[in-house]
Structure formats: C-alpha cells, structure tokens
Swiss-Prot record:
Record gene name: hslU
Organism: Marinobacter nauticus (strain ATCC 700491 / DSM 11845 / VT8)
Record bears the keyword Chaperone: yes
Superkingdom, taxonomy of origin: Bacteria
Keyword match Glycoprotein: no
GO biological process: protein unfolding; proteolysis involved in protein catabolic process
Compartment annotation: Cytoplasm
Binding site for ATP: 18, 60-65, 256, 321, 393
Protein name: ATP-dependent protease ATPase subunit HslU
Keywords: ATP-binding, Chaperone, Cytoplasm, Nucleotide-binding, Stress response
Start and end residues of each stretch annotated as Disordered: 136-158
Length: 443
C-alpha cells in the first residue's frame, strides 16, 4: 500500500494531467485515508468505511486518466471497469460480482510478481547452475565428491563469468524444462467466465508436472529457467491468503461510464438492464461477501470511484440508494484554450514531445513555435464549442490532420528540420475550423 501523502499524490498526477485540482485532491485524500485506516487498532479499523467518490464531468477532461495514473501510484489491487459491460443477474452477460473476482485475480498476479522479484537473486543463482550443467555436463562415472570438485573447477568458474557477461547468449543448449501445457482454449457463453477459468486452470495443472527437453539459445533458456526457479520459491497458498486480505483492506475499483446505466429523466419505463445493474451494485458497494476461486471476499472496505459524463442524464437519475453510497461528489471542469496549450506541452511525454520523437526516427527535427501551440489550442477549443465537446481527445484529431502531409513525406526525408508556425496551422486547418459542416466530419 502506498504511503504517499495527498500532496505527493497530487504532484505525481500533475505530471500527466492538466488542471482538475478538485478531482485530484479528492482521490489523493481517499487514497491516503486507506493508509491512515491501516494504522489504527483493529477494533476501530473495522468501523471506518471508505467514502466512495462520484466524478462528474464532460468527456475528455481527465476522469479516466486520473484512474489510470492512480492505479500506478496505489501499490494496491486496482481494477478499472465500464458499467456498460454488466447486466442484471439472471440475464445474459457479466454480473457485477465478476468485478471482485477480477480484482482478486489482479491481487494474486501483483503479489506473485512481487514475491518472484523478492526471490530474484536466488532464482538467478539456481538458473545459472542449471545452465552451466547443460553447458558442462559432468562425466557419468563421476561420484558425488568428483561432481563437487567439478562445480568448483576453474573451467566452470570461467564459463560462469562468460555467462554473466553475455558471451554465451547465442550458444544453443539442450535443457530440461517444465511443459507449458497444451494451451486448451475454452469458449463459454457470456456470464460463465468463472467456470471457464476454473476448467482452464484444471487442464493446465494436469500438464504442469510434465517435463520436456528443449533446444534453445542460452539467453532464452536463462529467462525460462529463472522464471521456473522463482516459481518454486513462491508459496502459492500464502499468496492467495495475502491477496484476499489485500483486496478486502486496500482494494480500489474504478467504475467508468456510470451515467450510461442511469435511467434518463424523460424515460419513465423501468429499464431492466440499466436499473438492474445499479441495484446489483448496491450490495457490492455497501458491503457483501463474494465467492471467488481463492476464497470468500468481503467488500465492506473496498473503495469505489465512479465516473460519468452525464450528458444525457443527471446524477439525480441514479437510484437514490446508489447516490447515497457515493457521498463525495467531484465536478471536473470543461477545458479552456489555456488548458489545451498546457496539455500540448506540460505533461510528461506530452503530445508535442511524442510527435517530435516520432519524426525524429525519420531524421526530421520537428519543432513547434509558441504561436503555433496557441493556434492549435484555439482551433481545438473552437471545434469543441461548435460541434461535439470531446475534450482533450480533440487535440489528437487536430494534430493528426495538421501533420498528415509531413508524416507522409518524412519517409523520403524531404527536409532535415521543420518548424510548425501559426501560419502553417492556419494554412492546414483554417478553412476546416471556420466551416462548421467540414469540421463536423473532418475534425
């Protein structure tokens, strides 16, 4: 679990997301409260439930990006799902309990990787010995003492040095490896993914103990053998127990597109698939027990963050019980021309840096003048205002259109340097941005 302070979390989010300070503060506080709760006595800890968050804002302003970046910072089981993927229990499709099952799978995978990394040095030593045994097999008539002498011989040490320096990477060896199984693929009806995964697990376990001699290069064999040796050092039962605890105490679920399952105000009929999903989410968010292949998981202390654009519906169109379980409301603001300018240049791996790097692979040094950045931002903002507002995603469309001819000609190395100026932006995009009919279809 991450022990970062709210200020540190916001600072990390600022590297990738422009503006939306209120939303960043809300998720930073929620993440820090997870850590604070774990410092308390167990009696008080059980009484403190997470304050779930509802993020409201137009598309393309950073709701999903906040979730993506938060997943990397959390150092806890984190799952992002779309509310539209689920259907009411009893109907064809995935039921909401599969969210917790997927979260448990994520936790097991995360903890297994951490454990394998912890045992990396021991696994590497064991892998080196197996590779050296394949390179320098001991004579058959050697007894145990002779083998021990051979292990410490100068020849073996010389080969070990060469192996570590990569001089033997291209040499082919024959080595005994665990069989990867037949790769049984089972197609199941929607809503029966749990049964499918259990059947696949059963078939893979049947062949997991079989071993097969393979011929491969030392570099490839080292990776396979190292993973095999690390897996031997990992206690799977302990990982499963830790995973259940991690999900129950620190799990975070981000539910995107929650507005798509809200019943619209003008539609008075009871829509089964929409309202049913909301009602199924209630016990999950409030606290219930879900059965998974690792054991039962209680959802009382899992943090839920929901988000939606709410273009065609309002937060009040969600059923009242669900509204009550999302007590913290955060409104994300629509982007301004200044925000667009900052998005183009400020974040790590910004759009401008990406295009400069892509053109650099063709030997073209691409630069953007300050007035060009401002003009691109104005065009994106104007098109958003006159057509559909798709937020920062409009910049991708505008930049692709702007640099289309340069991208096409760059392979022929027409020029070594190219500066995008405001005049060039006007030449390529001026007519399109002015003509609403054209921009509606092209930008």
């Amino acid at each position: 679990m991450s022990a970062m302070t709210p200020r540190e979390i916001v600072h990390e989010l600022n590297k990738h997301i422009v503006g939306q300070e209120e939303a960043k503060r809300a998720v930073a506080i929620a993440l820090r409260n997870r850590w604070r709760r774990m410092q308390l006595d167990s009696s008080l800890r059980d009484e403190i439930t997470p304050k779930n968050i509802l993020m409201i804002g137009p598309t393309g302003v950073g709701k999903t990006e906040i979730a993506r970046r938060l997943a990397k910072l959390a150092d806890a089981p984190f799952l992002k799902v779309e509310a539209t993927k689920f259907t009411e229990v009893g109907y064809v499709g995935r039921d909401v309990e599969s969210i917790i099952r997927d979260l448990a799978d994520m936790a097991v995978k995360m903890l297994r990787e951490q454990e394998m990394k912890r045992h990396e040095h021991r696994a590497l030593d064991a892998a080196e010995d197996r590779i050296l045994d394949a390179l320098l097999p001991p004579p058959r008539d050697f007894n145990e003492d002779s083998q021990r002498t051979n292990a410490d011989s100068s020849t073996r040490q010389l080969f070990r040095k060469k192996l570590r320096e990569g001089e033997l990477d291209d040499k082919e060896i024959e080595i005994d490896l665990r069989s990867s199984g037949a790769g049984v693929e089972i197609m199941a009806p929607p809503g029966m993914e749990e049964m499918t995964s259990q059947l696949q697990s059963m078939f893979s376990n049947l062949s997991s103990d079989k071993r097969k001699t393979r011929k491969m290069k030392v570099a490839d064999a080292m990776k396979r053998v190292k993973d095999e040796e690390a897996a031997k050092l990992v206690n799977e039962e302990e990982i499963k127990q830790k995973a259940i605890q991690a999900v129950e105490q620190n799990g975070i679920v981000f539910i995107d597109e929650i507005d798509k399952v809200a019943k619209r105000s003008e539609n008075t009929s009871s829509d089964v698939s929409r309202e049913g999903v909301q009602r199924d989410l209630l016990p999950l968010i409030e606290g219930s027990t879900v059965s998974t292949k690792y054991g039962s998981i209680r959802t009382d202390h899992i943090l839920f963050i929901a988000s939606g654009a709410f273009h065609l519906s309002k937060p009040s169109d969600l059923i009242p019980e669900l509204q009550g379980r999302l007590p913290i409301r955060v409104e994300l603001q629509a982007l301004t021309p200044d925000d667009f300018k900052r998005i183009l240049t400020e974040p790590d791996a910004s759009l401008v840096q990406q295009y400069e790097a892509l053109m650099g692979t063709e030997g073209v040094k691409l630069t953007f003048a300050d007035d060009a950045i401002a003009r691109i931002a104005e065009v994106a903002y104007k098109v958003n205002e006159t057509t559909e507002n798709i937020g920062a995603r409009r910049l991708h469309t505008v930049l692709e259109r702007l640099l289309e001819s340069l991208s096409y000609d760059a392979g022929d190395q027409v020029t070594d340097t190219f500066e995008v100026t405001a005049d060039y932006v006007d030449e390529k995009l001026g007519e399109l941005s002015e003509d609403e009919d054209l921009s509606r279809y092209i930008l």
